[in-house]
């Protein structure tokens, strides 16, 4: 991650965002205090597959990854921008004094692929695209670095363990005049092709169990900040477009069966504008048909495909999503965190951040739906991914509730791939949100893999998500009580086994160290009456009718 990612408070202008409703999802008026929230599930409506890849992470403790059957892991972040597979060296960029670090044996790209292949986890591997990778460097202090004291004796800060390596700032202003070859060597798209060929030689092509997905660098519009010692200039439409098509072509030449993912922008500004334009479409956009950055990126990839006989060079349209909220857990912060998930889908929700009325007054983001609308217009058939996201507070029940809500939204909205950045520790509440979907009973049982219609009369109090499981046809219903009070709510189930019992699994503040298998609930004529504890996640499992 990058220091600039903090909360990205920049000026911007409004963006025309698509408004589209998904069948089976209603935006309801809040229920009154005296009215119980009602829930309904229709097992035959709004059916579509849920991609298992939405439950991914950028990394995870080994036992936890095995416990939840981690489906996909990403090798990326700022260090990947200048990673040199030939000498296993990367540069930390502005994250840590622009230092070249030789990766240990457990931190190489080969080790990452091996570890994840061995546990059945698909891999997303980032390839460099900025034009520079780390040169041969010492394995211990003193390191090669982008702003050495020998060139820049006056800086605001130096590495306490390496006094020659500075932060590249003086009086809070970025220094200029760094010499790229102090740390790096110039490369072009052929380097990415060599890297993919190397991994194919080690692990085979994607079609035979090799690396399945390659990412076109990381947050490129921030290169002139994160990696400003080698790339001080702002990224333009033409630079990113040219480097992306050339690198994608090199990847596809080295492994035609591999998928390509990009552009992996850091957030709102990079979704809509180039580095030259800043945080709103400007002169650079005007010179490219008036399209925002994401729209033009997709169109450029489609045009490149058309010029090469229709061959696909972009398989996943990827952006990063960090909600522009604080990281606190006070009541106001917790309430905002839970509301903010609506920016992923809700056409009535306007951002309560610098993006919203107090800032650029953007219309509702409905981010996943907007990404899908851009794809449908400019490069149909491209999948949609979010390879970095984090709502925070994973050490708190509020973070667990939010993550459970987010995972439910990902499945309902048809996202194809997601990998959390800054994954929870196994004992933290945030980890239990993943367990509720991926291992709720400790025996590997999972939430369903075919999304079905699930509607709440007040999604802000009780969020509900439904899915049918293909292996046994059971209906699974996830209910997230976002309130501080127990909620008694009737659930109606249509076009499924209307009588019998439902298993109940709950994670709540009553015991933050386990998922509790409670008493079964009666299902009578398609109705379940249940009370959902305050600040809880509850999974109901309804078995299919016996034939």
Label the model's feature ranges.
Residues 245-253, 315, 321-390:
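Glycoside hydrolase catalytic-domain groove-lining segments
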Residues 221-228, 265-281, 346-357, 371-400:
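Active-site clefts of carbohydrate-active enzymes
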Residues 55, 303-306, 315-324, 389, ...:
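Substrate-binding cleft of secreted/luminal carbohydrate-active enzymes
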Residues 521-547:
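C-terminal beta-strand-rich structural cap/linker in extracellular carbohydrate-active enzymes
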Residues 396, 407-474, 498, 510:
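Glycan-recognition and catalytic regions of carbohydrate-active enzymes
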Residues 458-498, 538-541:
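Carbohydrate-binding surface patches
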Residues 2-33:
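Secretory targeting and sorting signals
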Residues 34-334:
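N-terminal catalytic cores of secreted or lumenal carbohydrate-active enzymes
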């Amino acid at each position: 991650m990058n220091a600039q990612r903090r909360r990205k408070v920049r000026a911007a202008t409004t963006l025309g965002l698509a408004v589209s409703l998904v069948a089976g999802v209603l935006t309801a008026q809040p229920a009154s205090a005296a009215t119980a929230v009602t829930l309904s599930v229709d097992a035959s409506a709004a059916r579509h597959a849920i991609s298992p890849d939405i439950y991914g992470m950028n990394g995870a403790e080994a036992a936890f990854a095995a416990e939840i059957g981690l489906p996909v892991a990403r090798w990326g972040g700022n260090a990947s921008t200048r990673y040199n597979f030939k000498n296993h060296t990367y540069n930390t960029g502005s994250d840590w004094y622009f230092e070249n670090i030789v990766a240990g044996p457990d931190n190489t790209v080969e080790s990452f692929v091996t570890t994840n292949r061995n546990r059945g986890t698909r891999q997303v591997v980032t390839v460099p695209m900025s034009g520079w990778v780390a040169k041969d460097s010492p394995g211990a202090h003193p390191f090669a670095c982008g702003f050495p004291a020998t060139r820049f004796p006056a800086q605001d800060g130096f590495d306490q363990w390496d006094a020659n390596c500075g932060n590249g700032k003086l009086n809070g202003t970025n220094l200029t005049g760094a010499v790229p070859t102090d740390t790096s060597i110039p490369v072009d798209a052929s380097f990415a092709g060599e890297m993919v060929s190397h991994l194919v030689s080690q692990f085979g092509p994607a079609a035979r169990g090799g690396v399945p997905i390659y990412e076109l660098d990381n947050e490129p519009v921030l290169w002139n900040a994160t990696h400003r010692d080698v790339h001080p200039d702002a990224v333009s439409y033409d630079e990113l477009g040219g480097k992306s098509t050339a690198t994608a072509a090199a990847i596809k030449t080295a492994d035609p069966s591999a998928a390509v993912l990009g552009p992996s922008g850091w957030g709102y500004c990079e979704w809509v504008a180039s580095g030259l334009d800043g945080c709103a479409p400007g002169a650079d956009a005007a010179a490219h048909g008036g399209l925002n950055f994401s729209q033009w990126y997709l169109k450029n990839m489609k045009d490149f495909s058309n010029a090469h006989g229709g061959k696909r060079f972009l398989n996943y349209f990827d952006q990063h999503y960090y909600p522009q909220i604080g990281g606190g857990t006070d009541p106001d912060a917790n309430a905002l965190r839970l509301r903010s998930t609506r920016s992923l889908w809700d056409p009535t929700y306007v951002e309560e951040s610098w993006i919203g009325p107090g800032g650029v007054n953007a219309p509702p983001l409905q981010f996943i739906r907007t990404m899908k609308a851009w794809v449908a217009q400019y490069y149909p058939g491209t999948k949609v991914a979010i390879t970095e996201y984090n709502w925070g507070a994973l050490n708190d029940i509020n973070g667990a509730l939010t993550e459970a809500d987010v995972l439910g939204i990902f499945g309902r909205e048809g996202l194809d791939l997601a990998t959390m950045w800054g994954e929870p520790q196994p004992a933290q509440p945030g980890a239990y949100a993943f367990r509720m979907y991926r291992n709720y009973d400790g025996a590997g049982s999972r939430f369903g893999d075919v999304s079905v219609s699930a509607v709440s009369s007040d999604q802000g109090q009780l969020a509900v998500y439904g899915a049918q499981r293909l292996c046994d046809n059971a209906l699974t219903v996830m209910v997230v009580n976002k309130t501080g009070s127990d909620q008694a709510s009737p659930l109606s189930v249509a076009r499924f086994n209307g009588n019998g019992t439902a298993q109940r699994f709950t994670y709540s503040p009553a015991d933050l160290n386990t998922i509790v298998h409670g008493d079964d609930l009666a299902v009578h004529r398609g109705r379940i009456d249940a009370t959902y504890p305050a600040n809880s996640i509850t999974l109901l499992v309804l078995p299919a009718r016996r034939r």
